[in-house]
């Protein structure tokens, strides 16, 4: 009888509680921890300290594919690239790189929801994301150094069935939303040499992989620096790789990290999560 009562007590206790949302700890870390703020500031401070040096290295690119097109390696001097006279540029991701969308995740947690394309698009239309710590100062410095700023995001172009006052029906309302959000967050306006490139803006840009978009940029610009919160922001054909393949890739390109590639921390979502496949996530836990 005592055992039965204990089981009933446990059942009643558990039924009165709600399971913690998968993103709770990660979102709280982003929104409240000084460590998140410090890490983001550190990444952008290091990147900022490299701006003038990389701007003047006319024969060096951060992009693996651009280097290959000249028969060279990323981060190494390439005479053919130097002779091409391309515009020096930094390529930055947007979400969780320059704009912090943790408020969107916090709302999902409060409402017991999960990420959905429609709710995400509503958030994009709201234009309410705030700057990631350090991002604003970095972009301002890049522009002051005469470096083109290219935003390359996986925000997807899609026609909204019903337009609204802020985003009337158009082929890619998400682009205007993003431009306006950047402006309201304090980022400098784009000038003709700068670019904002969305996923699906052209038919050949419909993949979450950014390779074709970086190739487009590389025709006119020397990609001197890559900044993002996902490994796919730095290199091509890596988003679907396994945990082990991704680790080997990082080890093989260690020299680029902190010199030409700048990786922000994002514990909330990303291709690191989709790499946990083929077995339960808990089986990836290391116990020794």
Name each model feature, range by range.
Residues 96, 126, 135-182, 231:
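Substrate-recognition element of Asp-dependent hydrolases with the DxDx(T/V) motif
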Residues 89-93, 99-101, 148-153, 194-198, ...:
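Structural recognition of the beta-strand scaffold that forms the well-ordered cores
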Residues 55-67, 75, 149-154, 190-196, ...:
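Surface-exposed patches in mature extracellular/periplasmic domains of secreted proteins
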Residues 34-45, 111, 125-133, 158, ...:
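Soluble non-cytosolic domains of exported or imported proteins
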Residues 5-15:
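Bacterial N-terminal signal peptides
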Residues 45, 162-288:
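C-terminal cap/substrate-recognition subdomain and adjoining C-terminal extension
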Residues 17-92, 276-288:
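Non-catalytic pre-domain segments flanking phosphatase-related domains
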Residues 87-88, 98-140, 144:
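Active-site neighborhood of HAD-like aspartate-dependent phosphohydrolases
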């Amino acid at each position: 009888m005592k055992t039965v009562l204990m089981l009933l007590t446990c059942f009643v206790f558990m039924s009165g509680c709600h399971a913690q949302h998968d993103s709770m700890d990660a979102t709280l870390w982003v929104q409240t921890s000084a460590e998140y703020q410090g890490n983001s500031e550190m990444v952008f401070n290091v990147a900022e300290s490299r701006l003038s040096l990389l701007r003047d290295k006319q024969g060096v690119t951060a992009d693996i594919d651009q280097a290959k097109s000249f028969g060279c390696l990323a981060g190494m001097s390439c005479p053919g690239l130097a002779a091409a006279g391309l515009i020096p540029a930094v390529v930055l991701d947007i979400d969780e790189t320059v704009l912090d969308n943790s408020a969107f995740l916090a709302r999902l947690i409060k409402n017991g929801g999960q990420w959905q394309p429609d709710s995400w698009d509503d958030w994009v239309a709201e234009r309410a994301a705030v700057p990631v710590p350090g991002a604003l100062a970095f972009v301002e410095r890049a522009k002051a150094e005469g470096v083109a700023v290219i935003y390359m995001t996986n925000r997807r172009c899609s026609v909204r069935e019903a337009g609204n006052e802020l985003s009337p029906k158009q082929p890619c309302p998400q682009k205007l939303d993003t431009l306006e959000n950047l402006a309201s967050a304090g980022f400098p306006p784009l000038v003709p040499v700068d670019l904002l490139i969305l996923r699906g803006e052209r038919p050949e840009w419909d993949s979450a992989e950014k390779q074709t978009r970086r190739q487009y940029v590389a025709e006119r610009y020397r990609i001197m620096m890559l900044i993002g919160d996902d490994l796919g922001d730095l290199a091509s054909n890596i988003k679907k790789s396994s945990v082990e393949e991704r680790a080997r890739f990082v080890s093989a390109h260690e020299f680029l990290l902190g010199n030409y590639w700048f990786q922000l921390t994002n514990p909330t979502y990303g291709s690191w999560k989709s790499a946990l496949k083929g077995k339960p996530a808990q089986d990836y836990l290391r116990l020794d």
